[in-house]
Amino acid sequence: MSNTSLLICASQCWPAQPDTTANSLNRLLAQQALQRSGWRGRLLLTLLHLRCGRVLLGGLLDLSLPGIMAHYHWRKQHIASWVQQHIEQQRIQQLIVVGAGFDGLGATLSAKYKHLQVIEIDRSATISVKLAALHKLNALSPNLCMKAADLSCSSLQQLLAETAEFFPDRATLVLAEGVLMYLAQPAINAMLQQLRQSVAAPLYLIATQMQLAPCGRPRFFKQRWLADMALMLSDEPFV
């Protein structure tokens, strides 16, 4: 699991979150993902369960990405709200989540909206861990489809064409949260063009983007050298 995925899972397990149904599934899914992600995941989960461990993690985050936990909480809360607004107001029948990671939004929405076909796309290792976790939590709805693909080197259009659960004539919402900063501009352009060519019905997009630093590369506003080092060591640089 990448350092970014570990951090996002940690944000879902942080005790300060409100106890809603969606947050509960996100927390349980994140815990399962950390347990299945080697020694780093298990160590992080242990630290999160201890008050002194959370103090230590909070200190490290203040030295690397101050405010990142609050950012993740705010972002996920508002994205979930925007997605549900689109589903209900635009009569969305299909949700494609690009780079779904270990987020529980797709599982939550597929259970809530039985008419909604949800297709989650991520790398094979992530999909494998997430499928096992959802099975254990009994949270895998029939209208939730998970597809393994590396979109930095594969065609989204071909993947969708080969997916029996994909319906090109359904009003579709695409969610790309925390994905675009890992793709070069030509890859982003190709992905958007392939989506437009794949869907014959109304198509909507909700995506996150990062501001560019003076060097011209994506970067968090308060990103410090410790975060730079972690991204470099885990081979997940923003492009």
Where are these regions (language model features)?
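Rossmann-like AdoMet
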Residues: 1-96, 102-147
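Glycine-rich phosphate-binding loop signature in dinucleotide/nucleotide-binding domains
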Residues: 86-91, 163-172, 199
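Short, conserved loop/helix-junction motifs that constitute active-site signature segments
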Residues: 109-115, 166-168, 197-200
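S-adenosyl-L-methionine
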Residues: 133-168
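A short, conserved alpha-helix within the catalytic core of class I
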Residues: 146, 155-159, 182-197
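A short SAM/SAH-binding and catalytic strip from SAM-dependent methyltransferases
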Residues: 161, 166-187
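Conserved beta-strand signature within the Rossmann-like core of class I S-adenosyl-L-methionine
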Residues: 173, 192, 197-214
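Short alpha-helix
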Residues: 233-239
